[in-house]
Amino acid sequence: MPSRYLVTAALPYSNNRLHVGHIAGAYLPADTYVRYLRAAGHEVRFICGSDDNGVAIEISALQEQSTPEQIASHYHERQAQDFAGLEIEFDVYGGTHHPDYVALHEHFSQDFFTRIHAGGYFTKRRTQQLYDAQAGRFLPDRFVRGICHHCGFERATGDQCEACGQMIEPLLLKNPLSVITGQPAEVRETTHWYLRLSDFEKPLRQWLESKQGQWRANVLNFALGQIKQGLPERSMTRDIAWGVPVPLDDPDARGKVLYVWFDAPIGYMSFTAAWCARHAGDWQDYQKWWCAPDCAIIHFIGEDNTVFHALTWPAMLMAHGRPQLPTAVVANNFMNHKVAGELQKISKSTTAADAPVWVEEYLKRGLDPDALRYYLTAQAPEAARTAFDPEDFVTRNNSELVAALGNFVNRALTFAARYFEGRVPDPAAQTDADRAHLAQADEALRKVGACLAEHRFRNGLEELMAYARVCNEYFSVRAPWSSRKDDLADCAATIATCIHAIEYLAIMCWPFMPGAARKLQRMLGRPAEMIQWAAPRPPKCGTPLGEPTILFAKLEPGALG
């Protein structure tokens, strides 16, 4: 069992707002996992930050008639606010070009490149690259679009096809067009440094095969399939101005920067070092998290990042030789948007700016962050692509959160407030039925915990809601409104059992819906942040309870537009 956990969530490009697909893909499951680990008593660091370098930022700067610095800073702050609004709480939210983090990040990135270069894993090669003669510049990565040479998708970029997820060889793109001018790209010569991924095929295969039965099949099948096809060389330098300068004393390296997918995952490490500098006084304490066999390193990503986190990044770590390989790479699929019954990809160019799929817009409407966290977990694209359906969101909020979980809590606590002076009644007359119900609570807590530990968040939430429905059934069968009239001791035992059950629910809610968990704690008269993943002790008779409040608000049809 690891003594520590280092959990990362994929760095979002700081060139756009966050949408529900981003949240469901990497950030919400990571936050859910971290909350569970901490409640279970583990030492955890949760690392994320904005990906400020590379082509995506340059393109946005051109489109918005701004500078890369301004784009990165602007969206970094907006994304940080979105995360805070959903209570996705990182220990550090850095930025690869943020003033507070850029120096350490460049140090780590350039040191990585230098070590890999010294190890002889790069091939320096004069090569042909796509070029925009009108703009007078080369067209790396997203600066060019064309038809994917793997699957035929018509808007593949020069580094990866978002339809099939495979890496792209830019010169094999059909009908390549410059994103800058729209003109057909031509071919010119330049020099770049290529990481020979083929050198790592055998150790990567062995490492991945050792994860069988531990990792999700979608990650393993994709990565092992890529190795079976043969891993290509990948250029780790680019002909652009915005990024980490290539740290070589070589005339051919002048004016070049590191490929964004070389330096981006290093951000996990540099941000950890920044946290250590701030909280432990020494940035080199990052080794406690990255170079120690007793620390588990868990990466949460979207499906389009699988190739980088399951192949390229581990190969870089192997070439470097020091840091630990990831313990797990947890990848989710894409989440689309259902509009008028039709599935649409969420996109800055095609999705309405005020659509509630943008986190910023959802929060502006004053809607419950926990309701969104619930729905995105219930619809989590863990094994296949799913969709955010505003109508289904309202239906599930009302029929599940309100009618099941919220209803039981309200029934039990308002009964205690009305008939037992807002205190825990005497459980002395508990029956076998009451004890059996609490045994179900123990089992539910165990099942939810097992699901969370295994990154099966959707199943964990299903177990929580299954127990909430059991609680409603228990309340109805025990009928305290009836026993109050002829057997007050039995009525008291029923309500005491319900209060104990709500304590279980508060614990199980914490990773998924922290706001709801705090509300439950307050209604139970407990400190709002004292959550431990362990069976709660029976509440003491006479303990004062808090005031019952509505746990979840009912939504009207069309509440999300």
Enumerate the predicted regions with their spans.
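A charged helix-plus-loop insertion that forms the helical arch/lid used to bind
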Residues: S60-S73
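Cys/His-rich microdomains that often coordinate metals
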Residues: L139, R155-A156, I168, A185
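A broadly conserved sequence feature marking short terminus-proximal activation segments
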Residues: R78-R155
